[in-house]
From Swiss-Prot:
Binding site for K(+) 2: 244, 454, 457
Species, as recorded: Sinorhizobium fredii (strain NBRC 101917 / NGR234)
Catalytic activities: betaine aldehyde + NAD(+) + H2O = glycine betaine + NADH + 2 H(+)
UniProt record similarity statement: Belongs to the aldehyde dehydrogenase family.
Requisite cofactors: K(+)
Protein name, entry field: Betaine aldehyde dehydrogenase
Pathway(s) served: Amine and polyamine biosynthesis; betaine biosynthesis via choline pathway; betaine from betaine aldehyde: step 1/1
EC number from the UniProt entry: 1.2.1.8
Function statement: Involved in the biosynthesis of the osmoprotectant glycine betaine. Catalyzes the irreversible oxidation of betaine aldehyde to the corresponding acid.
Keyword Metal-binding appears in the UniProt entry: yes
PANTHER family assigned to the protein according to its UniProt record, in alphabetical order: ALDEHYDE DEHYDROGENASE-RELATED (PTHR11699)
One BP annotation, GO: glycine betaine biosynthetic process from choline
Amino acid sequence: MKAQPKASHFIDGEYVEDTAGTVIESIYPATGEVIARLHAATPDIVEKAIAAAKRAQPEWAAMSPTARGRILKRAAEIMRERNRELSELETLDTGKPIQETIVADPTSGADSFEFFGGIAAAALNGDYIPLGGDFAYTKRVPLGVCVGIGAWNYPQQIACWKGAPALAAGNSMVFKPSENTPLGALKIAEILIEAGLPKGLYNVIQGDRSTGPLLVNHPDVAKVSLTGSVPTGKKVAAAAAAELKHVTMELGGKSPLIVFDDADLESAIGGAMLGNFYSTGQVCSNGTRVFVQRKIKDAFLARLKERTEAIVIGDPMDEATQLGPMVSKAQRDKVLSYIEQGKAEGARLVTGGGIPNAVNTEGTYIQPTVFADVTDEMTIAREEIFGPVMCVLDFDDEAEVVARANATEFGLSAGVFTADLTRAHRVVDQLEAGTLWINTYNLAPVEIPFGGSKQSGFGRENSVAALNHYTELKTVYVGMGKVEAPY
C-alpha cells in the first residue's frame, strides 16, 4: 500500500504495533483506495504511551527553555526541508489538493515549532514582586503529561499546534489523530526524534471513539487539548472536570461573514469563497453564513456564481486542482443531505448542489455549493455542515445584521468586509466570537491567538496564550526577617 507506515503507533521514540487493536483503514478520498492499514490502540498501548511520557517529562522540564527551543526549531527546519514529501502525505491522508497542502499544512506546523521554540525562554519568565523587606516571585511550570486529540481536516497542523507549545513549556504529549487521517502525526513524531527530542516526549497512538476516554480518564494525564465537534467536546470537558484536569478545546462553528454595501466586491467574494470552499469547506472557522447588504446582493451573487463555477475540481495531486474530495464518503453523504434539506426548506440553489462530472467516481467529490434567499430559521443556516456549502442571507442595516449574526450557539469566528474601518471596529466589538477578521478571512498565523467562545470551546491555540495553557503559575513568597507569631 502506497502510504503504509512501519507500524500503527509511535511510542518512546520508535514504531510499535499491536495487531489486537481494531483495524483502521486509511482511504485516499480521491480514489477510494486503501493506502494504509493500521490498528487502534489497545489499553496496553495506551498505558505504554502514557508511561513513556510520564517517565521522560521530568528530565525535559529540567532543561533550559533555550535548549528545548533549539530542538523544536530544528524540527521546523526538517519539516521545511521535507515540505513536498509531507504535503503529498497530507494530500493522501485528507484528499486536499497539493496546491493547498504545500503552502498551508506542513508549513504551518513548522511555523509552530519555530515560534514556540523561539519564545520559550522569554515567555516562560515570571514576575518579581517587592513587598517591603520581603519579596515574592512567580514562575510558570509545566503541567506534566498532556493529551492532544486531533481532527481530520488539518492533521499535521493540529499535531504541531498542540505539540509545539506543550513541549516548549516542558511537558510531554500523547497525541491521538483522527481515525480518518492517521498518517501525518506519525511523521511529525519521527521528525521530532531526528531533531533531537528525547524519547518518550511525543508519542502518537491511533484510535477510535473508545480510545479517547482511556486517555482523558487516565490518572497520569494532567491536561487535554481537543479539536473536534461540540458533542465530543462536551464529553471530554465533563470527563476532565471530574478529575479537575486542565482542558482546552477548539470546537465547531457557524460563523457569520458580513459584507456591507461599500465593501470591495471582489475582495469580499474572495473572502467568502476562502471561508467556504478552502479545504473543501472542512474548516471549523468557516464563515458559512454570508450576510450581504441588500443593495449589492444581486451583483454579489452574479459574480460569486461565475467565480465558483470556475473552480477546478480534480485529482488532488495535480497542482492545477483547486478543490479536492471530502475526507470520507460518510462526510460527503452528510453534506449532500444538508443540501437536500436546504432545497426542501426553500433556499434557492445558485450553483452546485451535487456530485461533479469528470472526476473519479470512487472519490468522495462534491460541487462547491451556494444557496441564496436563506433565512435564519433554515437548518442550513443553523447547523454546522462542514462542507463546501455557502449560505447567503440578505440584511438591511448594521443593528439588524449584528443581532442576527449573534443569534447562534456558536462563537468561533466572524468576519466583516467594509470600506469604513470605524464601522468595522464597531461591529467586531459587538460580535460574539473569539477570532475575527476585517477585510480578510480565515488567516491564522501562529503569532495570533485562535479559538472561540460559547459552544465553540475555550482556550486558545497559537501565540503566547497557548503557551500559558500548558503551564500553571507558581507563587513563591520569600521572608527576609524573623517570623513574628502571636503564640
